[in-house]
């Protein structure tokens, strides 16, 4: 039986301290099984890991936060083209609900993306999530773009690390205001900031 989900769309300034602490706990539990390092950014009540989202879709059920997706509008560079996008990140579904939350969260977010007037939304996820993201793209909402790496700045300055990192990730693009045929070609996306 599917749990009853209640979806909340909120701007970052609308979140209370209690929202941040509840989300931080959700992210630690959701990202922790993929490695301790992945849960570390959410210590101390942080409900973001790199760049802070401007808008969030949060799914709740009887047990609290069940799913989450964050959005940040930004300019990225794909090949030689500068492009306004809505970056989608901080995707998460509580482990006991996997398979139920991501599709619903993008469906809640999609009308908002249209209202924001962005040409595309994009997200980058681990290759291990190919099946999950593939299900999302099956209905034509998005396209997995293969062979693209993403370069980002680190969220903090570390004297022992370079200021940027380039990752081989799975890139998914959602055409919003323009058709997918207008997504620029290129093998590198420059985020020009930290990942969401």
Curated annotation (Swiss-Prot):
GO terms for molecular function: acyltransferase activity. Keywords: Acyltransferase, Cytoplasm, Nodulation, Plasmid, Transferase. InterPro entries: NodA, Nodulation_prot_NodA_CS. Pfam families: NodA (PF02474). One of its GO terms (cellular component) is cytosol. Its EC number is 2.3.1.-. The keyword Cytoplasm applies. It is an enzyme of class 2 (transferase). It is found in: Cytoplasm. The keyword Acyltransferase applies. NCBIfam families: nodulat_NodA (TIGR04245), PRK00756.1 (NF001974). Belongs to the NodA family. N-acyltransferase required for nodulation. Acts in the production of a small, heat-stable compound (Nod) that stimulates mitosis in various plant protoplasts. This is Nodulation protein A. The lineage of its organism: Bacteria, Pseudomonadati, Pseudomonadota, Alphaproteobacteria, Hyphomicrobiales.
